[in-house]
């Protein structure tokens, strides 16, 4: 019995594997069991069928480093987002608060800086370069120029605009019964004195179609100009046709037809008729024996000679 107990004790105390460090492994199952039982991993070096693995402490350190990097990145992104949101809300709130103050300051500054369109009773009308509004120096830093124009356009009147840019024809006051002349632009428009206008109105009176009157003025004008006969200076004279011997036939044309075909003939005719009338009176005084002069007036009849 004592011998059997001694053998069992030797079996448990017998060294099965001696590590490189001198440590003894009493169990054979501790060798090549994928665990570092020796402490220097010498019990796993000569294992042919089992792949060597690093100690588990290396994996734990790498995992902790990756977790630290991820946490730092997430915290940094959150801080940046929060700062951007706070800055945005701060700027929008400041602009919302300053907008009523700016509009009120602009309304108060309009009568102080000068009205864009002053009334005639307050001051004489300024030129185009003097009525432009110059913004205040402090407004240049509040908003860009296009935003200032957009905001300031609400206070500008829609009319009147700069009046030298509006090209309108001149206004002519006509009396009752007058026919306005055909407008052909400011270059060809001619204003007449009252005497010429009354004479032109008498010339435009339409005569009976069966009357034929000799007119020495028309003969002289036709021979001088060589063109179509202008309207007669006598009441009831036809100017539609003119023969070589000075006989006028047919109804006279209307004023609009004459002015449409010959816009400058009326004014030229008045000058020439006045010149011929003066020369005719002088010739009548010199040769008062047998001069034929047509009589103007309401009592004149065809064939009355002086």
Curated annotation (Swiss-Prot):
Q: How does it sit in the membrane?
A: Single-pass membrane protein
Q: Give GO terms for biological process.
A: negative regulation of cell migration; negative regulation of epithelial to mesenchymal transition; negative regulation of SMAD protein signal transduction; negative regulation of transforming growth factor beta receptor signaling pathway
Q: Which residues form the LDL-receptor class A domain?
A: 16-48
Identify the InterPro entries for this entry.
LDL_receptor-like_sf, LDLR_class-A_CS, LDrepeatLR_classA_rpt, TMEPAI/LRAD4
Q: Where is this protein chiefly located?
A: membrane
Superkingdom of origin organism: Eukaryota
Chain ranges on the Lumenal side, renumbered to this chain: 1-64
Q: Where in the cell is it found?
A: Early endosome membrane
Q: Where is the stretch described as Disordered?
A: 286-306
Of the GO CC terms on this record, one is: membrane
Output one GO MF annotation.
Answer: R-SMAD binding
PANTHER family found in the cross-reference section: LOW DENSITY LIPOPROTEIN RECEPTOR CLASS A DOMAIN-CONTAINING 4A, LOW-DENSITY LIPOPROTEIN RECEPTOR CLASS A DOMAIN-CONTAINING PROTEIN 4
Query: What domain comment accompanies this record?
Result: The SMAD interaction motif is required for interaction with SMAD2 and SMAD3 and the negative regulation of TGF-beta signaling.
Q: What is this protein called?
A: Low-density lipoprotein receptor class A domain-containing protein 4
- Native species of this protein? Homo sapiens
- The record's gene field reads LDLRAD4
């Amino acid at each position: 019995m004592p011998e059997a107990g001694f053998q069992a004790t030797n079996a448990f105390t017998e060294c099965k594997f001696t590590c490189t460090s001198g440590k003894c492994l009493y169990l054979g199952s501790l060798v090549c069991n994928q665990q570092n039982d020796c402490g220097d991993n010498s019990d796993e070096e000569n294992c042919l069928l089992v792949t060597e693995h690093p100690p588990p402490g290396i994996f734990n350190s790498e995992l902790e480093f990756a977790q630290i990097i991820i946490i730092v990145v997430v915290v940094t992104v959150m801080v940046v987002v929060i700062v951007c949101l706070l800055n945005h809300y701060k700027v929008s709130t400041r602009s919302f608060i300053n907008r009523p103050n700016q509009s009120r300051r602009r309304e108060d500054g309009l009568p102080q800086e000068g009205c864009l369109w002053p009334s005639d009773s307050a001051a004489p009308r300024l030129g185009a370069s003097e009525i432009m509004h110059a913004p205040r120096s402090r407004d240049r830093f509040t908003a860009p120029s296009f935003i200032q124009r957009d905001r300031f356009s609400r206070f500008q009147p829609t009319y009147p605009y700069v009046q030298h840019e509006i090209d309108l024809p001149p206004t002519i006051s006509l009396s009752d019964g007058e026919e306005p002349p055909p407008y052909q632009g400011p270059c060809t428009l001619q204003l007449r004195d009252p005497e010429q206008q009354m004479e032109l109105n008498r010339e435009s009176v339409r005569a009976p179609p069966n009357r034929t009157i000799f007119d020495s003025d028309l003969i002289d004008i036709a021979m001088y100009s060589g063109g179509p006969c202008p309207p007669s200076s006598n009441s009831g004279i036809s100017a539609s046709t003119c023969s070589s011997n000075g006989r006028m036939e047919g109804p006279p044309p209307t004023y609009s037809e004459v002015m449409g075909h010959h816009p400058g003939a009326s004014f030229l005719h008045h000058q020439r008729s006045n010149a011929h009338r003066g020369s005719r009176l002088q010739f009548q005084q010199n040769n008062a024996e047998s001069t034929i002069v047509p009589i103007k007036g309401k009592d004149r009849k065809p064939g009355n000679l002086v």
